[in-house]
Amino acid sequence: MNLKVGIIADRLNRVLTGVGTYVYHLVRELSKIEDISLITYQDPSLPFDVPTVIKNPFGVFSNHSLYLWHLYVNGALHRTTEFDIIHSPENAALITPVACKKVITIHDLILYLFPHYAGLIHRVRYRMLLPWTVKTADRIIAVSQSTKRDLVTRVGVPQHKITVIYPGVGPEFRPCNLNTIKEMREKYHLCNPFILYTGTLAPHKNVSTLVTSFKRLKDSGMPHSLVITGVKGWRYHSVFETIRRLHLEKDVVFPGYIPYEDLPSIYSAADLYVYPSLYEGFGLPVVEAMACGCPVVASNVSSLPEVVGDAGVLATPAVDELATSMQEVLSNEGLRGELSRKGLERASKFTWEKTAAETKKVYEELV
């Protein structure tokens, strides 16, 4: 049976962050399956392109009009009957009835559970659309058991409607050799040993707490820098205010957005990766770090214990607890080696091929 699947993929029209990475790799792996025909709704002129996929039959709006773009695509899908499945893999609502089965991937419920982490218009729109989205979907893919629990207990979605499918990590995420690491250090001017954080600068990512914990380490004589990469999100200014207040301008390094191809080398070069988030639906950067052999300290909240298992140190995402865990790992070479080995083994369980195969199974169950 040849399945015709339409995938709403406007995340490929922007800088790739966690959800965009999921969409990109899901589309790439599904496109390799012979009995699935894909059409994605994206801008084919941008770099995140999958050559074997038909793209963009309905046109593209600017990044500043993505909400209108969703309405436009929804209207177009309402009129078409060419698909067996329409899949929205990025929390986006399919708000009009369509003549085929609808699948949606829910990555997290951050704006539903913690509405103060977004602006008024965005959070009102999300809280209005999410209940309708999950009600009208034929199947919901949750990226973790934690996200599934949130959907069941907080939104009232029936358990039988939800399938948990973990995201993956690509084979490009592996420990890099010394020459590659040296080139990366020179490119981004990273001379000192360093602790790494990658991700959006947003309130729920708790980066200001990480900076304050790092200050405790500097006061104890640790030689490390703190390297913070990623895009500036909502209310990112608080991170820079914390750095100035603690006089850490020379110790906290912002190389900016790191291109995808450079991520493995920066993970490989770090002595420690820290993920202090207050809430995650999955936590893909943690798996990427483990896949590169970097020891991990992560928050003990939401999905992160599920993802990390015993392959990292889990800590309460507060200043003292994070500082203690970071100090413990950095001062114990044997522990770092153990976490590196366990992380490599743990990360190997998450592959995009597996994600795509399990997603295909969901499609087949619906038609």
Spans of model-derived segments:
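Carbohydrate transferase catalytic cores enriched for Leloir-type hexosyltransferases
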Residues: 1-367
